[in-house]
Amino acid sequence: MTTEISNGEAKGHHLSTIPSSITLSAEQFEKLYLSPMMRQQPSLARKVGNPTPLALGGFVITTTPLSCCLMAWRGSSGNGIAFIGPIIFLGGLLLLITSILEFILGNTFPCVVFGTIGGFWFAFAATMIPSFNAAAPYSSSATSTTAGLTSASFMNTYAFLFITMAVLMLIFLLCATRTNVVYTLIFLSLLLVFLLLSAGYWRLGEGDAAVGDRCIKGAGASLFVASLLGFYLLIAQLFDAVGLPITLPVGDMERFWPRSQK
């Protein structure tokens, strides 16, 4: 208690205490960090900021315009070559930074998710940059990246990367069932994205433009759904972060899996 002298009178004021750390419940932890709470909450997580919204922000800023491009809205084309900058600095870099921060906090699952998806964005952008010379050898002149990106041999080859990413998304999908419904649906949407992209590239490689283009547009639609779910999850986390009296449900899936403590 402190004492203040005003006009010869003493006035007492009680000091207020501001908590320096907050302990989260298992459900709150899984909603904010997108990772099952497998052990006691680390002390560092109670003192520092939550990095997960940073990755979600980078994800939605990248996937939303790219999905519109894949669906050819407003005459857009190029399979995302116009978004090389955002793909590198928003999709790749922000997810990589978040992956490192999640590693420091001990959150293995989001660390792996954000790190691998961020790495994919870097690789995807690098393929379209002429200085990497990834697509140019597939062109008839062996020097044109633009022509190489649309060549049959390149598409037939690059589709294997999408198939591999689809397998990875399936693994993430299974792991995400320990967290919440929204996060699980994001990986389900991404699984469809990579399956449709691989199918589209193989059909285009075979010269079947009609089916190939439909598959690419279907991949764009699935990616758009994933971006909308990402926006929802981002809003839910930021509302909690600033203490708004609005709680958006994300569908906690604890009822399907028993919690294990380590």
UniProtKB/Swiss-Prot annotation:
Gene coding for it: alcS
GO CC term (a single one): plasma membrane
GO MF entries: acetate transmembrane transporter activity
Keywords (A to Z) from UniProt: Cell membrane, Membrane, Transmembrane, Transmembrane helix
Topology relative to the membrane: Multi-pass membrane protein
Organism the protein comes from: Emericella nidulans (strain FGSC A4 / ATCC 38163 / CBS 112.46 / NRRL 194 / M139) (Aspergillus nidulans)
Membrane-traversing stretches: 53-73, 81-101, 109-129, 154-174, 181-201, 219-239
One Pfam family it belongs to: Gpr1_Fun34_YaaH
Family label: Belongs to the acetate uptake transporter (AceTr) (TC 2.A.96) family.
Domain of life: Eukaryota
Protein name, UniProt field: Protein alcS
